[in-house]
Amino acid sequence: KLHVLHGLIEMKSYDEVEKYIAYLKDDYHEKIGYISESIKVPAVAGFLLAKVREAKQKGISLLIDSDSMLLNKEGLDELYNELLIILGVLIDNSMESISGENDGKIIVYLYLNTEENILLCKVYDNGCGISKDKLENVFERGYSTKGENRGYGLNAVDTIVKKYNGLIDVESEVGKTTFTIELPIEEE
């Protein structure tokens, strides 16, 4: 992008420079800017930006739901750090389930409900899905349908959810999966 700007400046095409900068600004806001507007926790916003780029390199569309709102509330640093683990596992698993699929899509929804003191996290994908007979085992340590030395991520997510006396729900069928996690937050 800088090469384009440099070239346009060297050619003294200043009107084109202006147009290109406007395009970049709109493109940035459309694809990335909304993350920093709705996700106010810097570590989580940065992590999601990195995952959006990683997904794009794999041909997958990773979107943050436009209704997401994660405020940077004081005293929740540990919870936010554990949210990074949860998001990492769920997004990585989603990317693996989509691998090779056309029009792969992942949608992440995060919401800190300060009235009910709940952090809500949803991750949806249109990957291969999880069959009903395997759903009951996905949180067991070491259980995996992907081979040996796997099956620790969802167990870690389950451990975090239990630590906070939260809830985790999985809805899956062929072609789509949604993980929904509710984590109660302590009032200060």
Predicted segments, located by residue:
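Conserved ATP-binding N-box helix of the HATPase_c
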Residues: 1-9, 79-102
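Conserved short strand/loop->alpha-helix "switch" segment adjacent to the catalytic nucleotide/phosphoryl-transfer site
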Residues: 64-86
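Short conserved segment of the HATPase_c
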Residues: 130-141
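Detector for a conserved hydrophobic position within an alpha-helical segment of the HATPase_c
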Residues: 160-162
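Short beta-to-alpha transition helix within the HATPase_c
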Residues: 19-22, 26, 37-58
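Acidic ATP/Mg2+-coordinating residue in the GHKL
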Residues: 125
